[in-house]
């Protein structure tokens, strides 16, 4: 799931993420009696083709960005502006989190939605 970020106006996207988190909670309750853990991972911003297109659109619409590459625009506008750690997440970051949830080390964790987003959701 994408990162949970206040101020975003993409209602269908955010509602679907909220539904998955609620579904995670409900499944954890229902499946716990069978010793099944259910958790969700909420990734932050990961450089993808969609982000490339968004960055390219920003460059096209803003002359001040013409000297920047799409990745540089992404890093400035999507990563540094939104995350206290100032770095985007990688597929490996998400994979490590999923591997943790699949391991015995997380045997007492269920019904959680873990944000792996560089602190983007801190209040």
Predicted feature descriptions by range:
Residues 1-19, 24-25, 29-33, 45-46:
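Catalytic loop of short-chain dehydrogenase/reductase
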Residues 5, 98-99, 110-123:
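Short C-terminal tail/terminal secondary-structure segment
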Residues 24-25, 95-98, 102:
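Short-chain dehydrogenase/reductase
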Residues 32, 37, 109-111:
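Short, small/polar-rich loop/turn modules that mediate ligand/substrate recognition or access, typified
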Residues 37-43, 47, 102, 115-117:
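Conserved SDR Rossmann-fold cofactor-binding beta-strand/turn motif
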Residues 42-53, 57, 61-62:
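Short, flexible catalytic-loop segment of classical short-chain dehydrogenase/reductase
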Residues 57-58, 63-76:
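C-terminal beta-strand-loop-alpha-helix "lid" module of Rossmann-like NAD(P)-dependent dehydrogenases
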Residues 70-71, 83-94, 105:
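A conserved structural motif in NAD(P)-dependent oxidoreductases
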């Amino acid at each position: 799931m994408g990162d949970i970020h206040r101020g975003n106006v993409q209602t269908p996207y955010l509602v679907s993420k909220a539904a998955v988190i609620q579904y995670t909670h409900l499944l954890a309750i229902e499946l716990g009696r069978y010793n099944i853990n259910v958790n969700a991972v909420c990734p932050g911003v990961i450089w993808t083709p969609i982000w490339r297109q968004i960055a390219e659109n920003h460059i096209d619409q803003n002359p001040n960005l013409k000297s920047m590459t799409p990745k540089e625009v992404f890093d400035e506008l999507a990563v540094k502006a939104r995350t206290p750690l100032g770095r985007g997440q990688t597929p490996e970051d998400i994979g490590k989190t999923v591997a943790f949830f699949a391991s015995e080390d997380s045997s007492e964790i269920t019904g959680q939605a873990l944000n792996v987003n560089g602190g983007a959701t801190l209040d």
